[in-house]
């Protein structure tokens, strides 16, 4: 009959009370009477009841998607097991069940925090955090471990390089660790086991939940070049903060990270992967934008003479590149350089394809001169390091795309 029940937490608690009462009475009869019941009979009855109870609990927990309810279920199991263990009934199978419930609890936490992360990313403005006063500055750094000597020297108001999602994400990771820790309470586990449990669940949060949210964010159509640049900056700061998360767990469990077999946090790879994905998306979006400008090109291939200056579409494209790469001044030099190289190579290839188009049957000298003016303009801007941040230097060796 137990296996046919559909239970909520209240009915489970009532079930536990009934079972405990029954077996406490059986235990009392066993020890207070002669020959009325035997230990073998009591053990057989207990094993049968335990199998039914475990089946019901396993089914109940598998359908529970609220971490608070799973936590209540765990607490009931612990009380039930501890009580009957006090009467010498074997409860190892119940503690084994707790490992399954723990996995279910972690899954519900991960789903909950996936929604939290998505909301944070949706509400972020992807702009540096403005701080007007010292109090505001202290409030931010109390939530996120940020230290920059140059920024600290600046007068107020000033801006911090990361956007508002960074301290929010960091705070929520810590909240997840606290929530994960709740399951370990009253389980009679060693500090090392709890430390390992926390680190493994946090790794799942970083490498699966947060990583997926970041990758999905980067691919969203409304995320432009400015937002991608900010995401790269954000992930850099989150990556640097991973060691503080390590310390946070260590302070909770008092288990040294140098202990043999201590699980390390994999946040570094999560944020590096997201950063590389954002960089790749920057290169892709730049090329797509170049294609849009190229589609505006309307050469009169039969024109008698050139206009004497670069084409309007090309100057618009160059102005776009100038303003776009100004946004890249906060990126590592290699990223800005690679983006410039990628954009210029794509532009030169597109111009070459335009000139060698098989549908183009005849070109006048005037059209060739006009096209040549455009190529010269591209070459001039490129060699002046239009697309490169000034700290890379003017002596940088540039491939001859044009």
Summary of predicted features, one role per range:
Residues 139-142, 378-382:
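Short C-terminal domain-edge/linker segments immediately following a structured domain
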Residues 1-88, 136-302, 306, 320-339, ...:
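Extended alpha-helical solenoid scaffold regions that build the rod-like backbones
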Residues 95, 107-154:
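Alpha-helical repeat/alpha-solenoid scaffolds of the HEAT/ARM/MIF4G superfamily
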């Amino acid at each position: 009959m137990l296996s046919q029940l559909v239970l909520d937490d209240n009915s489970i608690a009532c079930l536990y009370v009934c079972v405990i009462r029954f077996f406490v009475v059986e235990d009392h009869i066993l020890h207070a009477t002669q020959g009325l019941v035997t230990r073998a009979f009591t053990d057989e009855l207990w094993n049968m009841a335990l199998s039914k109870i475990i089946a019901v609990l396993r089914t109940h927990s598998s359908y529970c998607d609220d971490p608070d309810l799973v936590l209540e279920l765990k607490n009931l199991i612990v009380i039930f097991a501890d009580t009957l263990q006090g009467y010498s009934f074997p409860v190892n199978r119940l503690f084994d069940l707790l490992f399954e419930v723990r996995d279910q609890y972690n899954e519900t936490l991960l789903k909950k925090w996936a929604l939290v992360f998505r909301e944070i990313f949706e509400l972020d403005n992807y702009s540096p955090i403005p701080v007007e006063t010292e109090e505001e500055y202290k409030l931010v750094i109390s939530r996120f471990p940020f230290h920059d000597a140059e920024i600290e020297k600046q007068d107020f108001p000033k801006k911090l390089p990361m956007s508002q999602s960074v301290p929010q994400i960091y705070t929520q990771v810590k909240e997840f660790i606290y929530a994960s820790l709740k399951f370990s309470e009253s389980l009679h586990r060693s500090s090392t086991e709890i430390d390992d449990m926390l680190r493994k669940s946090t790794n799942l949060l970083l490498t699966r939940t947060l990583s997926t949210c970041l990758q999905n964010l980067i691919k969203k159509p409304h995320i432009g070049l400015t937002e991608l640049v900010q995401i790269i900056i954000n992930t850099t700061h989150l990556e640097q903060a991973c060691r503080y998360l390590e310390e946070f767990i260590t302070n909770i469990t008092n288990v040294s990270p140098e202990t043999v077999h201590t699980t390390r946090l994999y946040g570094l790879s999560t944020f590096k992967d997201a950063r590389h994905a954002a960089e790749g998306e920057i290169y892709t979006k730049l090329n797509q934008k170049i294609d849009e400008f190229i589609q505006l090109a309307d050469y009169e291939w039969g024109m008698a003479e050139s206009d004497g200056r670069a084409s309007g579409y090309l100057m618009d494209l160059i102005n776009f590149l100038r303003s776009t790469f100004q946004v890249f001044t906060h990126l590592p030099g290699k990223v800005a350089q690679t983006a410039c190289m990628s954009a210029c190579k794509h532009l030169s290839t597109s111009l070459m394809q335009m000139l060698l188009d098989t549908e183009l049957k005849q070109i006048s000298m005037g059209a060739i001169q006009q096209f040549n003016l455009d190529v010269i303009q591209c070459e001039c801007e490129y060699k002046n390091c239009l697309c490169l941040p000034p700290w890379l230097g003017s002596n940088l060796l540039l491939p001859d795309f044009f």
